[in-house]
């Protein structure tokens, strides 16, 4: 009975710690997520730029103007949002994000912890294969449950309204999706989210390996008390940032495909069809639009989430003892 009670307390602890970590990270990095989503969208306005070229071999020596299209960068999108929509638009989608991030992180970390317990009994305990299967299982469950909320969040982030005009709130956006697309509309982009499980697996495999290395490092064993806690905390932040950065670079294209699938009235119908269409119309570089904003957002966000999670687990477990 005591063992069952202890397992229940551990699950609640991971739920609470994961929820707190996700909430803190979402608030701090919301503006960058809005910019990233705008950059990923097919509706991002391409600026036409004219480059003059002088051909000296011509009789008149006249210049020839070459036309090309340039994708706006992070700072240009930020400037456009501030000028046309106001600073509040940088926090579009924060409502559903806060509604969803705490339960999603809570479910994820609880599933991850539970799955790791199960897989430790099948494979070599705490090996990389355990972390891979645990992260993949947790991501699958979380994506399946939370996709409707993330769908609404993406729609709100893509909505463009001039400064001072009324924008849809979370409930209005959800109602509009239901009226125009039905229940299936809330699950657009889910296949891309499943493809993105590879990012989660890569991230946690690297993170757990780095965390194990930090525990065994000579510096960690030679310090004591407050100094050790501080070293561990910043070490975990660095490990989280590095693991997420590597994973994002490898698996980023699925994010662009997911955003395209969630656009209102879009021509994108399925994961494979969207990938082919984006490649044919825009080239392979389109799959990495917004990557810089993603790295700027996700690296500190993941560092905040994982470090807050580890800190709360450490403090509460230490307090319980």
From Swiss-Prot:
Transmembrane ranges? 12-32, 49-65, 121-141, 190-210, 233-253, 298-318
User: What range does the record give for the signal peptide?
Assistant: none
The subcellular localization recorded is:
Mitochondrion inner membrane
PROSITE patterns in alphabetical order: SOLCAR
GO cellular component terms? mitochondrial inner membrane; mitochondrial membrane; mitochondrion
Q: Which domain of life is it from?
A: Eukaryota
Q: What is this protein called?
A: Solute carrier family 25 member 33
Native source organism of the sequence: Bos taurus (Bovine)
What gene is this protein a product of?
SLC25A33
């Amino acid at each position: 009975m005591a063992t069952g009670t202890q397992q229940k307390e551990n699950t609640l602890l991971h739920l609470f710690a994961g929820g707190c970590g996700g909430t803190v990270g979402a608030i701090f990095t919301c503006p960058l997520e809005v910019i990233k989503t705008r950059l990923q969208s097919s509706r991002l306005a391409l600026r036409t730029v004219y480059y003059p070229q002088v051909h000296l071999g011509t009789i008149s020596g006249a210049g020839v103007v070459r036309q090309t299209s340039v994708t706006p960068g992070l700072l240009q999108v930020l400037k456009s949002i501030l000028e046309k929509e106001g600073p509040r638009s940088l926090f579009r989608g924060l409502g559903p994000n806060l509604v969803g991030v705490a339960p999603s992180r809570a479910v994820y970390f609880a599933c991850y912890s539970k799955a790791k317990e199960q897989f430790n009994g099948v494979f070599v305990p705490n090996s990389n294969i355990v972390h891979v299967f645990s992260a993949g299982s947790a991501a699958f469950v979380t994506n399946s449950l939370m996709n409707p909320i993330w769908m609404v969040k993406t729609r709100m982030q893509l909505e463009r309204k001039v400064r001072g005009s009324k924008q849809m709130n979370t409930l209005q956006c959800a109602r509009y999706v239901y009226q125009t697309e039905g229940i299936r509309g809330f699950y657009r982009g889910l296949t891309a989210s499943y493809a993105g499980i590879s990012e989660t697996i890569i991230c946690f495999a690297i993170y757990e390996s780095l965390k194990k290395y930090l525990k065994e490092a000579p510096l960690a064993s030679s310090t004591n008390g407050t100094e050790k806690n501080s070293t561990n905390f910043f070490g975990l932040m660095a490990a989280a940032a590095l693991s997420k950065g590597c994973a994002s670079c490898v698996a980023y294209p699925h994010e662009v495909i997911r955003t395209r699938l969630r656009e209102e009235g879009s021509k994108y119908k399925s994961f494979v069809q969207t990938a082919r269409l984006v490649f044919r119309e825009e080239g392979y570089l389109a799959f990495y639009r917004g990557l810089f904003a993603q790295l700027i957002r996700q690296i500190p966000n993941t560092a905040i989430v994982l470090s807050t999670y580890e800190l709360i687990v450490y403090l509460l477990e230490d307090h319980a003892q």
